[in-house]
Amino acid sequence: MSRLSIFPDGSTSMDQSSPTPLLVTETPAEIQAELARRGIGFEQWPALQELPLAADQSWILKAYANEIDRVKRDGGYATVDAIRMTPDHPERVALRSKFLAEHTHAEDEVRFFVEGRGLFCLHLGAEVLLTLCERGDLIRVPAGTKHWFDMGGQPAFCAVRWFNNAVGWVATFTGNTISERFPTLD
């Protein structure tokens, strides 16, 4: 079940080791409303297609072509791809480490979870929002938003990703270690 946990970022607290959430909700309408108040998009779609184990990117993109085209058109995104992570993926440790570091992008980060789950952590001013996205969730993180992503130590997800550029995922790391103070997906 999708979940939103809102924490103070701890920057004004003497004890930054164990933050206490200000709000925790698993109600989709409340998640959507809280994120929207902060400029983050959140939708839930029916993830009707069961992915065969051997489904490749072209199969995934074809299965969700109508939804992909709508988001691409509405957001002006130039390219789209699909990423599928499994517990035995050879780059899972390196990718998790990279994604766990706080960073920004020059473009929106838009993801639709076809299967599995991932934790988007958004550092917005004096708040940190941990947004657990699961199958059927679409999240739009605006360009320039400080955030990190946790796919877990044994990742098992597939997400469609939209981009404004042909290069794909390009991050600018902030150097802030804030992600180390907050719960992870595991």
From Swiss-Prot:
One Pfam family matching this protein: ARD
Tagged with keyword Oxidoreductase: yes
Cofactor: Fe(2+); Ni(2+)
Positions with a binding annotation for Fe(2+): H103, H105, E109, H147
Record's keyword terms, sorted: Amino-acid biosynthesis, Dioxygenase, Iron, Metal-binding, Methionine biosynthesis, Nickel, Oxidoreductase
Subunit relationships: Monomer.
Record-given protein name: Acireductone dioxygenase
